[in-house]
Amino acid sequence: MSILSERQKDDLNKSIAEYLYAQDLTEIADSLCARLSLDYKSEPNSKYAGLLEKKWVSVIRLQKKLIESENRYTALQEDIAAGPARRRDAQVDWLPTAPARYTLTSHRAPITRVAFHPTFSLLASASEDTTVKIWDWETGSFERTLKGHTREVWGVDFDSKGSFLATCSSDLSIKVWDTQQWDNAGYSGKTLRGHEHTVSTVKFLPGDDLIASASRDKTIRIWEVATTFCIRMITGHEDWVRMTVPSTDGTLLGSCSSDNTARVWDPTSGVMKMEFRGHGHIVEVIAFAPLASYAAIRELAGLKAATKAPGAYIATGSRDKTVKIWDVHSGQELRTLSGHNDWIRGLVFHPSGKHLLSASDDKTIRVWELSTGRCMKVVEAHSHFITCLAWGPPVQAGGDIKAASGSGNLRGTGADTERRMNVLATGSVDQTVCVWLP
């Protein structure tokens, strides 16, 4: 019984036939086509031209990468056995320091979003050049380019298992790519259509069955991945919805907009739970605070009541050059963080819960101490505006360190602290992606 699907067998047979035709072995190729009942004629621009050779080279490259990965894993295991506690303690508060470990170049237009694969050392970058590129962040090597959108790509997100990658674009579409099918020539996955203007963000909701998207058409839409149907449209913002992001348990959905507000919604009903007003310009980015940061935020705001409910606090970044931290339940602004000299474009909470990192058009990353609101570090990161940043993937409690590779150190300081790989990625208008490692 063949392990290949019918489509894969057809692609393989046609690739072999094309190779034979290219070698002027026409009689053998014709005989093969007849024997396999294959309806195929060689053409100069056929998608099968050179495909067999490419596959062969890919296998050799994958074998080499497998050997390298096994060697890195063996070295890592030896390192852990020599002193795991000391390594964890030394790295738990790691923060990025210039210069970046890798500067990834291949895009031909500004980078718009970056996202880490949850298991492997892969990084996806979206760009205004209409493509998504996949990189190995541990080695800094380029893996592949995904082509399918016809205009700028604004958002990219992996599901929790890394089986699917969602992207969104100015071409009004959302695409869902099966990561196991990347090597198939011409594959562009499922396409979700319904937005009436640029789709600016796409996010998998916890459980991976649903996707949330935000658009310049002023709506947020919830999509069913299996059927590609839009099952809910959320309205309320008065202008372009720049970003939407779910809370860790999926019970809340945050959004921010060109109407200068941020909002929190019930994604099941579409009902708005809270509106946040205070920014004096477009709100570009929103992030839910993880449980690990709650103690520091309460200290910052002088709050006594403790809560462990996901989605209790959010941070927003705006073109007014400030970052604001809010209490979701009351809508109260807890603190404004000022220091950037230009638009805020990216926010991420440090996995230790002690810091908040922000990225700006002033070309810097700033590290804020959450308990005091003090800017404790400024990193000169890019030669042009920074458009996005992302911290490495979380490793769930009880997760095997084998899920990480190389120097992706796993960290944990308590029950509420999310263990994460110490890696940060930033994207810029300078058309590069920077990878920051210890």
Swiss-Prot record:
It holds the Pfam family WD40. Residues 58-82 form a coiled coil. It is found in: Cytoplasm, Cytoskeleton; Cytoplasm, Cytoskeleton, Spindle pole. Its main location: cytoplasm. Keywords: Cell cycle, Cell division, Coiled coil, Cytoplasm, Cytoskeleton, Microtubule, Mitosis, Repeat, Transport, WD repeat. GO terms for cellular component: cytoplasm; microtubule; microtubule associated complex; spindle pole. InterPro entries: Dynein_regulator_LIS1, G-protein_beta_WD-40_rep, LIS1_N, LisH, PAC1-like_LisH-like_dom, WD40/YVTN_repeat-like_dom_sf, WD40_repeat_CS, WD40_repeat_dom_sf. The keyword tRNA processing does not apply. Residues 8-40 form the LisH domain. WD repeats lie at residues 106-147, 149-187, 194-233, 236-275, 278-336, 339-380, 382-425. Signal peptide: none annotated. CDD domains: WD40. GO terms for biological process: cell division; establishment of mitotic spindle orientation; microtubule sliding. GO terms for molecular function: dynein complex binding. Positively regulates the activity of the minus-end directed microtubule motor protein dynein. May enhance dynein-mediated microtubule sliding by targeting dynein to the microtubule plus end. Required for nuclear migration during vegetative growth as well as development. Required for retrograde early endosome (EE) transport from the hyphal tip. Required for localization of dynein to the mitotic spindle poles. Recruits additional proteins to the dynein complex at SPBs. Belongs to the WD repeat LIS1/nudF family. Dimerization mediated by the LisH domain may be required to activate dynein. Self-associates. Interacts with NDL1 and dynein. This is Nuclear distribution protein PAC1-1. It comes from Postia placenta (strain ATCC 44394 / Madison 698-R). The gene is PAC1-1.
